[in-house]
């Protein structure tokens, strides 16, 4: 099955969003991927969340840009990055953002994989932390090997909803929209996502990365 076949039925622009390849030592150890290298695409995040929205798109871009800041031209190592969420796990869209970050980085909360053997090799648990209130951004990423860390902030106002949404969204949410209005609502919804992950994917005014000092 090709990527095109697998993503059939999804908006075509998903394939235009930036993807990321990581090396996963656990996948290599257990023979799940050649050399442990795996590529993640925006469609994978959509499958995980069950939907595509500005939050999922923002989480995707924040994690990608955070990893690029940490690793530069080197390939990021999955399972070797801690994810710090500023807010509590049940606060707003924090859980959605954390799920996307976990998909990409492999970082899991206390319920995650505890590792292999007495040395707990390749453990992923306790790498995803909530309530790190000192963050200036939405999330932070820290390399386990070097300790280098960054914080990432998203400014969604860079890509606002069109004026047409002001009337459509309340009708769609309340169940009062017609079939034609619902189709238009979905079209406008995904168009904002498209602008984020395609047109503004490298926009540093939307996704802002800065150094983070972790005690």
Annotate the PLM regions:
Residues 1-52, 61-215:
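Non-transmembrane, aqueous-exposed alpha-helical and coiled segments at domain scale
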